[in-house]
Amino acid sequence: MKGKNKYFTDYDFEEAYQKQIDNLQQAEIERLTKNRKGIAYQTKTTKAGNQLEADIYPAFGNRQDAPRTKRGNKSRPAQKNLNDKRAKRYLNNLISANFGKGDIWATFTYDEEHLPESPEDADRIFANYIRRINRRRRKAGKDNAKYIVVTEWSDDEEKGIRCHHHVIIDGSNDRDELENLWRQGSRNHTRRIDPDPDTHAAGIANYITKDPHGRKRWRASKNLKKPIVTKSYSRFGKRTAERMATDRGYLEERITKAYPGYKFIDAEVKINDINGGFYIYARMRRD
């Protein structure tokens, strides 16, 4: 949208910039950037726990110069169905903002006698499970559980209904207690989270959101902290951003300088083959 700086940024930059610059020869990059459009670069910073993401992408003087994308009925990041990269990234940040070392990652299954009739029935069963947990917690003087649940559902002609829940929940409950309160199946697994310092919860998020054979949907408790998102036109100027896109050492140097107290992890650079603009995505973690 156009704000007080009169830049147009109301477009899907993740969809508009998809060609990996690392896969291109220098001559191809120069050809694509010859007629480059865009008068500034906007930086979107997302802080989630000790993780930080920076999206750096072109802003335009008018709508006509911005790349066209298929807007249609785009799914929102907070959707129940995990059907696109945006939803998975949102979920990863939500996990990073709320969970860490000592919290619990669990998988709960159903035996044949307790299979839900539908995904909605599975949601109801899991909601009842959380109510049982929270009753125990209130008696112990604890707050309600913080959790994220991803439900995987399939209904195959040969195998029939298959359903299970991947859950990340705060570590206030004992693992045995959590398993005992689940009454729909016995093939369950719980473990304490011990995240990698660089990727934090990304490994868990990637696993529980991997492309399923059936459907995946997710829900979260209402007491979670939201990732902190800010936007700026002044963090990286146009010339700086364009040099960062083609000089990996300079990219790491400028990103590290822009976010003191954070360690650079990795970055990827993409280019739009119509307007020659760059999109930089960088990840960092707090030292």
Give a label for each model feature.
Residues M1-I161, G171-D287:
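Right-hand nucleic-acid polymerase module
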Residues H164:
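Conserved, short, structured surface segments that act as functional micro-motifs
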